[in-house]
């Protein structure tokens, strides 16, 4: 594996944050400097965490996932007042979801290791599985290449019900068939059987989406020391009750903090991305197997436009009786994370970084400071055949990242032709139509009754010219079919569906191609935190 860094243009909050723009950095409580991390450690030392209860839960949960010894030791280390976490989170995508989930975890592991060495304190890696998510459409699919097209392959569970990812039971038989269909689209390699066994072993131990995700991730990172947490685990929810109560008692201040911070963001020229009603309480409650967002209505806490209604006392009572019914929204999830874990740093993708910039005053309302927010490592893998295609087309490795691949294809094709086709046909059409317009005037003068037919005649001639143009272009493309297929392969591999590779393709393809130790070998590479994109040649 060879690693190379390239600069890929970013936009908005992420670009300005990485470029060190003071205005947007003022929306975060810590800059990404070593001094800021030292200050963060000092700030965390002044806070209290329910470490023993948390460790007891994490030991039980990670042991059930058959965690390695390094993970167990890291969990136990959290009992120590001078142990901190680097944390990130993601939904429980089937087969772990898009590659960026793996890249987030690699980011967490690397930053935890680096900060432990540089700060001289114990830092452990934590990955937060968003088990409360009810949006199965976000996690129930993967993308494959089939018949030279990119296809979205959806897992259709035979027993679908509106439940969270932590509670949605998987039909193992259906899931096995779905996995088989996916692997049929991959080339069979020396690793295929091992990878399928690896996946099936995790599936066989799982009842829910979160179980399957947790077992797969734990097996993939078995020796890394990674700690997993299911954000919707009933035992964790019990530990969170005091903070849920605090949010309910301060929901107006939370909403005001969000509104004020979004005004700051607007003044800086950015568009806020968090959308909430002014009466939002920022907590979901599970009612009749549905996740209902609570809102304030004249002192009552209501859901679904008043279909459900609770007094403050009733809500608090329900939190104490059934904490597993409650979960956070996009605004309060980061706050709950801050309450539960002694967070040295949070690692997020571009979207997360943008919405965290809207939360500073929300954190302050609760009496917290935002942890350092570190953009995750971004990676693209280039296989040998794709590197060969790039070389054959005389393209740089950075070209598909800096330019639209379709545009690169068009430019290449136009360079193979002496005269530009589009311009020549535009000229020809103009000349022919000019002559025909003159002819139409002549016909109209002699026989006005033929005016309509003359107009149709012009349309037919135009159609024939366009047909000729299409046939010429088709023949040229056929002549250069080999090269144009290289562009298609590059597009599919590096910019599938016009998106970054890590947002579309799944890690299982790479495990199948390169073996079960693929992720371990990627983790051995040195990644930088300078905002550049990492290209790994395989």
UniProtKB/Swiss-Prot annotation:
It is an enzyme of class 6 (ligase). GO terms for molecular function: ligase activity. The gene is bshC. Belongs to the BshC family. Residues 460-485 form a coiled coil. This is Putative cysteine ligase BshC. It comes from Bacillus cereus (strain Q1). The keyword Chloroplast does not apply. Its EC number is 6.-.-.-. It holds the Pfam family Rossmann-like_BshC. The keyword Cell wall biogenesis/degradation does not apply. Keywords: Coiled coil, Ligase. Involved in bacillithiol (BSH) biosynthesis. May catalyze the last step of the pathway, the addition of cysteine to glucosamine malate (GlcN-Mal) to generate BSH.
């Amino acid at each position: 594996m060879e690693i190379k860094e390239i600069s890929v243009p970013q936009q908005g909050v992420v670009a300005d944050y990485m470029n060190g723009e003071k205005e947007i950095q003022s929306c975060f409580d810590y800059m990404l400097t070593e001094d800021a991390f030292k200050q963060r450690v000092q700030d965390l030392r002044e806070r209290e965490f329910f470490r023993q209860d948390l460790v007891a839960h994490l030991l039980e949960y990670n042991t059930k996932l058959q965690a390695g010894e390094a993970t167990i030791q890291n969990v136990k280390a959290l009992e120590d007042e001078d142990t901190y976490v680097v944390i990130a989170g993601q939904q429980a995508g089937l087969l772990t979801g898009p590659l960026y989930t793996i890249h987030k975890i690699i980011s967490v592991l690397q930053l935890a290791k680096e900060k432990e060495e540089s700060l001289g304190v114990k830092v452990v890696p934590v990955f937060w599985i968003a088990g409360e998510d009810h949006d199965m459409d976000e996690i129930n699919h993967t993308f494959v290449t089939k018949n030279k097209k990119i296809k979205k392959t959806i897992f259709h569970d035979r027993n679908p019900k509106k439940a969270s990812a932590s509670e949605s039971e998987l039909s193992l038989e259906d899931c096995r068939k779905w996995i088989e269909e996916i692997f049929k689209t991959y080339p069979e390699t020396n690793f295929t059987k091992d990878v399928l066994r690896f996946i099936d072993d995790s599936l066989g131990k799982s009842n829910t989406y979160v179980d399957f995700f947790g077992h797969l991730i734990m097996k993939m990172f078995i020796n890394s020391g990674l700690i997993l947490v299911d954000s919707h685990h009933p035992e964790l929810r019990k530990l969170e009750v005091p903070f849920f109560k605090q949010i309910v008692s301060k929901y107006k201040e939370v909403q005001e903090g969000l509104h004020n911070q979004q005004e700051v963001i607007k003044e800086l020229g950015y568009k806020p991305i968090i959308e909430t009603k002014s009466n939002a309480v920022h907590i979901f409650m599970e009612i009749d197997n549905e996740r209902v967002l609570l809102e304030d209505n004249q002192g009552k806490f209501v859901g679904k436009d008043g279909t459900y209604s609770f007094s403050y006392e009733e809500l608090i009572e329900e939190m104490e009786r059934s904490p597993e019914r409650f979960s956070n929204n996009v605004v309060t999830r980061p706050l709950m994370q801050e309450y539960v874990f002694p967070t040295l740093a949070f690692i997020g993708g571009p979207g997360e970084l943008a919405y965290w910039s809207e939360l500073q005053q929300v954190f302050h309302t609760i009496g917290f400071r935002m942890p350092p927010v570190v953009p995750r490592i971004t990676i693209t893998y280039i296989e040998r055949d794709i590197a060969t295609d790039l070389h054959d087309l005389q393209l740089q490795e950075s070209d598909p990242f800096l330019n639209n691949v379709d545009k690169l294809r068009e430019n290449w094709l136009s360079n193979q032709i002496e005269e530009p086709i589009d311009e020549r046909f535009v000229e020809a059409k103009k000349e022919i139509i000019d002559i025909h317009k003159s002819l139409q005037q002549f016909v109209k003068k002699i026989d006005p009754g033929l005016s309509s037919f003359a107009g149709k005649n012009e349309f037919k001639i135009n159609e024939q010219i366009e047909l000729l143009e299409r046939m010429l272009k088709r023949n040229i493309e056929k002549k250069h079919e080999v090269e144009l297929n290289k562009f298609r392969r590059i597009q599919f591999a590096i910019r599938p569906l016009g998106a970054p590779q890590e947002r579309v393709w799944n890690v299982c393809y790479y495990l199948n191609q390169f073996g079960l130790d693929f992720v371990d070998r990627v983790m051995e590479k040195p990644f930088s935190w300078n905002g550049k994109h990492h290209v790994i040649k395989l």
